[in-house]
Regions:
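Conserved CoA-thioester-binding segment of acyl-CoA-metabolizing enzymes
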Residues: 1-61
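An acidic, glycine-rich surface segment that forms the CoA-thioester-binding/catalytic face
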Residues: 37-41, 45, 71-111, 150
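A general structural signal for well-ordered alpha-helical segments in protein cores
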Residues: 71, 149, 158-161, 193, ...
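CoA-thioester-processing core
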Residues: 92-98, 106, 112-165, 195-199
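Acidic, divalent-metal-coordinating active-site segment for phosphoryl/phosphodiester hydrolysis
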Residues: 113, 169-175
Length: 265
């Protein structure tokens, strides 16, 4: 099922409770110009505000995930300190505050610069075995400004992150898996996309939406405000969840030995 949102460079497909978002400039290796940044921002905005959507999947059309920024088009906007994101969108690098919907990303081919940062902003990442990664900003006189300087050291460890951030060298899917940039490696692009969709549906179709949101919120709070702040919220949040219809349904479905039918209430 398609969705009525006027986007030119990003495709949208609703698959049950999952929104599949596809980078759609394959003729340019999915390099991000201003239009594509705005389109992906609006797609992420839709994912967050549509209560019927419980998870998102980010994929790319063509042979490559992304060649990074189209610097000739985007550089003037970035250099002027202007935001490329519309009012009804969200920051695709997820630097604009808490998010309530989990995101699974599938990558193939070349994944450069902001592509790596899109992966780091996702909750689960799957790659095809042919993928090649590089954070090449330092080779262009700038530096990664979409979160890699913060997230890659945190996720991969300082040495692993600096090995690639400071040199701009290319690395393969096996190395991406070793350092924790991706969680799974599949045979090819089709398998990566299928696995990402499978994981998203495991979340959207089986897990209670309120439980998923509370889990994300707790983990995000620990990262942004520290463990003590997250620990302080554990008991109050579980008390709140025990009072929901979904918690009652979780117990009842267990007693009746049937799949739970969660409503997000």
């Amino acid at each position: 099922m398609t969705i009525d949102l006027d986007l030119q460079t990003v495709t949208l497909e609703r698959d049950g409770h999952v929104l599949v978002m596809g980078l759609g400039r394959p003729e340019k290796r999915n390099a991000f110009d201003r239009a594509m940044l705005a389109d992906l921002s609006r797609a992420y905005g839709l994912l967050e505000r549509d209560d019927s959507l419980r998870a998102g999947v980010l994929v790319a059309h063509g042979d490559h995930f992304t060649a990074g920024l189209d610097l000739l088009d985007v550089a003037p906007t970035i250099a002027a300190g202007e935001s490329p994101f519309p009012a009804d969108g969200r920051d695709p690098w997820r630097l604009d505050g808490p998010w309530t919907k989990p995101l699974v990303a599938a990558v193939q081919g070349r994944c450069l610069t902001l592509g790596i940062e899109l992966l780091l902003a996702a909750d689960i990442r799957v790659t095809a075995a042919d993928a090649r990664f590089a954070q090449i900003e330092v080779l262009r006189g700038i530096y990664p400004f979409g979160g890699a300087t913060v997230r890659l050291p945190r996720d991969a460890g300082w040495g692993n992150a600096m090995r690639w951030l400071l040199t701009g060298d290319e690395f393969d899917a096996a190395e991406a898996h070793r350092i924790g940039l991706v969680q799974e490696v599949t045979d090819d692009a089709a398998a990566a996309r299928a696995r990402a969709l499978e994981l998203a549906h495991a979340i959207a179709d089986r897990s209670a939406p309120l439980g998923v949101q509370a889990t994300l919120a707790s983990a995000q709070l620990a990262r942004s405000a520290g463990e003590a702040a997250a620990f302080e919220r554990l008991q109050p949040e579980v008390v709140r969840l025990f009072g929901t219809q979904d918690a009652a349904e979780g117990v009842q479905s267990f007693v009746e030995r049937r799949p739970a039918r969660f409503q997000g209430r």
